[in-house]
């Protein structure tokens, strides 16, 4: 049992709590911060509400919903955060490649309260940013969980769609980030073969100023750098310095820890037995330009320290990992 606990990093501390059998008013007052942040809204309810009320245009999808605590109006509040990603499965090839190239901002809902009608209470939902409580300066999401297609930016006679405001005016934008590559015909032909999309080579929409953005799925992007880690399938977003970042948890595993109990896990469609696991890496991905940083969060993990020796130039090692969340 001890070996298994060590291998899985299970640290259980038993604590006895004195309970009188009744709750007094002063006890409630002392713990009002805890009581105010008790989750009463179910995640699935938020997902359903988003699908019913926020996807009427068909351009966006909200599959990544996660709990997060933000300081809103001077008070810590437990919320659900859902990045607004572009829906690429229901629109045409030209639209998703040249116009609907990116998602737009985040929706934030309260996890601790509902409206008077019992519906989900949205704290931030306006795509134009009029209720931008986290002060996001760059809301566009070019890299995410749903971004599985190539995007071409700065094309001839086409601008990228941002949103339509309440007056019916379409707002557009041209990508000016560091990501993407500017290529000629032969390079486009190679990319077309690699992506099994000959239209990239044959199109007349691409100019010398255009950029082709590939490898936009953040999980696949991280795997391409460190393929030996296991990556969480439910990354979440945070806001730092006005920018949206994805946080992707990564795990090291082994099946060779002495005397530890085996567990069967399924990953990438295959099953394997492991008896050691550590959540020793966090990957931070900029949602706008795809820049990735790998942070070691557990320096006592011998597996990740071995990777550091082999691929030291790929990982930034920190004694303490912390990303400050922008708040209002």
Language-model segments: residues:
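Soluble extracytoplasmic regions of secretory-pathway and membrane proteins
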Residues: 1-328
């Amino acid at each position: 049992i001890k070996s298994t606990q060590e291998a899985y990093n299970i640290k259980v501390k038993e604590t006895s709590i004195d309970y009188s059998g009744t709750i007094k008013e002063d006890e409630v007052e002392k713990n009002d911060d805890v009581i105010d942040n008790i989750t009463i809204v179910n995640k699935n309810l938020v997902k359903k509400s988003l699908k019913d009320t926020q996807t009427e245009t068909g351009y966006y999808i909200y599959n990544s919903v996660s709990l997060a605590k933000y300081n809103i109006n001077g008070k810590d509040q437990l919320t659900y955060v859902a990045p607004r990603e572009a829906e690429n499965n229901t629109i045409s090839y030209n639209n998703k490649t040249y116009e609907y190239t990116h998602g737009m901002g985040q929706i934030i809902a309260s996890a601790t309260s509902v409206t008077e009608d019992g519906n989900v209470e949205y704290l931030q939902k306006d795509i134009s940013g009029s209720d931008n409580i986290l002060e996001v300066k760059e809301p566009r999401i070019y890299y995410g969980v749903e971004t599985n297609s190539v995007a071409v930016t700065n094309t001839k006679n086409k601008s990228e769609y941002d949103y339509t405001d309440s007056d019916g005016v379409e707002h557009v934008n041209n990508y000016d980030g560091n990501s993407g590559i500017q290529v000629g015909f032969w390079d486009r032909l190679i990319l077309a073969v690699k992506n099994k999309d000959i239209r990239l080579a044959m199109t007349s929409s691409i100019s010398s100023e255009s950029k082709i953005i590939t490898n936009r799925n953040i999980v696949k992007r991280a795997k391409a750098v460190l393929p030996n880690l296991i990556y969480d399938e439910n990354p979440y977003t945070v806001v730092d310095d006005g920018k949206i970042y994805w946080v992707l948890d990564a795990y090291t595993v082994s099946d060779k820890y002495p005397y530890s109990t085996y567990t069967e896990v399924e990953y990438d469609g295959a099953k394997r037995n492991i008896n050691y696991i550590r959540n020793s890496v966090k990957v931070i991905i900029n949602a706008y330009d795809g820049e990735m940083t790998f942070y070691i969060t557990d320096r006592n993990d011998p597996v990740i320290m071995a990777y550091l020796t082999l691929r030291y130039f790929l990982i930034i090692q920190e004694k303490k990992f912390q990303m400050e969340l922008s708040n209002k």
